Regions:
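Short, well-ordered alpha-helical microsegments
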Residues: 55-57, 174-175, 196
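Active-site-proximal loop/turn and secondary-structure-junction residues that shape catalytic pockets
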Residues: 16-18, 50-52, 76-79, 110-114, ...
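N-terminal pre-domain/capping segments
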Residues: 1-105, 134-135, 141-145, 183, ...
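Active-site acidic/histidine proton-transfer and metal-coordination neighborhood
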Residues: 84-188
Length: 196
């Protein structure tokens, strides 16, 4: 075998069935169809999508029936544009949900100044994407470390998801973020589809 399936688990995001940013893409696909097809394809884990039940017990039951579990959940942070008190409160609520469904990873993407959902705004040209200054980098990395520490104290790994149209999009921005955060608390969710 290519890998030991007792130690390596393959998960998938539901974006191939329904798109959270553009719900009309895959709008006809139900939650039940999505997770059933994931399981039939051999995946044992998945991220949470917009059609998933919001009740942890209902979600866990549906996945248990298919031999699956939640691998992670996307969390939109706003470290640069709201207070850390608000950020921590929302982050902890997401950890509570993930804990209830048996997950131990959370994928974080900084959405302050994001243009990812603006289909009429170019991401790579025209200077539309926000570029952080040194002060913003400091605030961002300290905030990310704080969220990572909270996650770690609860047995979670915070995995940062670089994303097109956000303040951490390029390889240089990703390198700077990783170099200025604590490796005990901040991990990388490497996305080849979004790396520029």
């Amino acid at each position: 075998p290519m890998f030991d399936s007792n130690h390596v688990f393959l998960g998938i995001a539901p974006i191939g069935w329904c798109n959270d940013d553009m719900p009309e893409l895959g709008g006809e696909n139900t939650f039940q169809q999505t997770v059933s097809e994931m399981a039939l394809a051999g995946f044992t884990g998945c991220e949470i999508g917009n059609k998933y039940p919001t009740d942890p017990a209902e979600l866990k039951k549906a996945l248990d029936l298919r031999g699956m579990r939640i691998a992670s959940r996307w969390y939109s942070s706003f470290i640069l544009t709201r207070s850390m008190e608000e950020e921590e409160k929302d982050f902890i609520a997401n950890l509570d949900f993930l804990e209830a469904v048996g997950a131990n990873h959370i994928n974080v993407s900084e959405q302050s100044y994001s243009i990812q959902g603006k289909v009429d705004v170019p991401i790579l040209t025209g200077g539309h994407k926000h570029v952080m200054n040194d002060e913003e980098w400091d605030r961002f990395c300290k905030g990310l470390n704080r969220l990572g520490q909270i996650a770690s104290e609860r047995g979670f790994k915070l995995c940062f998801h670089h994303h097109m149209g956000t303040v951490v999009q390029t390889s240089e921005e990703t390198d700077r973020m990783m170099s200025n955060t604590d490796p005990r608390y901040v991990f990388l969710c490497y996305d080849t589809g979004h790396f520029t």
